[in-house]
Amino acid sequence: MNLNEYFSNTRYFKNKIIVISAKNEPSKKIKRFLSRENLGLKMEIGYRNSYIAVIDNKRGFIFEKADKDIQECSYKVKNKYIDIISAGFESGDKSSIKIDSVEYSNNRRGLNIAIFHYKSLALVDKFFVDTCEDSSLTIRR
């Protein structure tokens, strides 16, 4: 399955929180991610930039930020925080998505994505997509 197929049915993500953290070089093939518009994302990512995004479909909240420097964000859901770090190739080369010190990022090149259920923050799915080299945007676990 590829990234466009995965995010084609937005109703499935109604009560979910989608978290994205980029590592290394996420920009080369990102324009092929056509379903990003279904999620409300612009994904204006420069070469070797850091990038984070949070899509909270329950609350209708979308946040995204890209920059050459390391990006960090803590998103509060009820009494817990989702801590997100993205560092592009030249700013640390790292991806992290944590809840209560538990790591959910695959920490691989491209986009690292974790999806959580809104009520419990239980992990629904996690995967990565090599948006640097993989033109088909294949989901890898």
Describe each PLM feature range.
Residues 1-141:
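Short acidic-hydrophobic catalytic motif
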